[in-house]
Amino acid sequence: MEETRIAFKKNFSINIDGLDLEAKEGEIGSIPRWLAQILEENNSIEIQDTDVLIYISRSLNRERISKPHDLSGIDLDFYIRANDFIKRLKDKEKESIVVSLNSFVTSRIEKIVKLAAASALSVDLEKKLSAEEKELYNFIHKYSLEFKQRAVNRYE
């Protein structure tokens, strides 16, 4: 479970399912993302976004410089983290990152389609994909195989 850096806005103490959390106002720490979202809604914490912006920027840059037939690695929860970050931005701030992410996604989809049409998902490639991309890869692979079989079987 991915953790998020946060700053506490007030003194805090909680025990949820064996997770003990105690902090004073102003302290900085890391907690599971799901808990951070709940506490942020209750105005108990502030999520530290700078780390996420750096993380997203690095991922975008790695993909941009990767070879046309190679996918750069991203974390399993990349899109979840990116979307959580975007939700907290003001409209003016969202525009440039959303444009960059759309370009990133388009590039990755093109590569995934080519790779999935050619072969099943390898262990090495699986490590480079997010959860959503794995699902897309397997979907494309399955249906491209079915299409190839139907297209070729017409002549037998």
Residue ranges and their predicted role:
Residues 1-14:
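N-terminal, Lys/Arg-enriched amphipathic/low-complexity engagement segments
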Residues 51-156:
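Charge/polar-rich, low-complexity and marginally structured segments
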Residues 4, 29, 40, 94, ...:
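Functionally constrained cores in energy, signaling, and assembly domains
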Residues 4-7, 46-51, 68-69:
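Short, functional N-terminal and low-complexity linear motifs
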Residues 11-53:
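Compact, well-ordered interaction domains used in eukaryotic information-processing assemblies
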Residues 6, 23, 31, 39, ...:
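Generic hydrophobic secondary-structure signal
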